[in-house]
Amino acid sequence: IYLLADVGSIGGGWLSSRLIARGLSVNAGRKIAMLVCALCVTPVSLAVFADDLLVAVGIIGLAAAAHQGWSANLFTLASDVMPRRAVASLVGIGGMAGAVGGMLMAKYVGAALEGVGSYTPIFVGIGSVYLVALLISHLLSPQLEPARLPA
């Protein structure tokens, strides 16, 4: 699974760079790459129904690769839209939010598993959250225009 995640991280960055090099805008290149990654995560919803361990591992591996490709593009969005002096702060705030989200997710997963007795709602949620996040990202910044911060 971790090797697939490594490939996904490199592949996600490669895909957006390739799309931009072929003439797409940075906005289109990043968002198309993120859409591809989001779509590759969606099958993880089916992992809980896999009868074969290797099939489940393959589905989860694909999702891990797609997550890393998504992350590569998400972190690059910061440098696409923010001035150089603000990138580290933005990424740091995002990292903090991710850490808090991870803590909350651990609590939610435990509660869901205890209440429902199954990982199904967690995997279904994971399978859809990337598409929702991409939609929110697009609604917040449809053109990925550079932010203008006061000096």
Can you name each region flagged by the protein language model?
Residues 84-93:
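Loop-to-transmembrane helix entry/capping segments in MFS-fold secondary transporters
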Residues 73-81:
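Intracellular helix-loop hinge segments at the cytoplasmic ends of transmembrane helices
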Residues 15-16, 20, 108-117:
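Interfacial helix-cap and linker-helix signal at transmembrane-aqueous boundaries
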Residues 42-50, 124-151:
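Multi-pass alpha-helical transporter architecture, strongest
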Residues 1-20:
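Transmembrane alpha-helices of Major Facilitator/SLC transporters
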Residues 27-74:
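C-terminal transmembrane helical hairpin of 12-TM major facilitator-type secondary transporters
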Residues 8, 12, 101-105, 136:
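Discrete transmembrane alpha-helix packing/kink hotspots characteristic
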Residues 3, 61, 65, 92-100, ...:
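Transmembrane alpha-helical cores of Major Facilitator Superfamily
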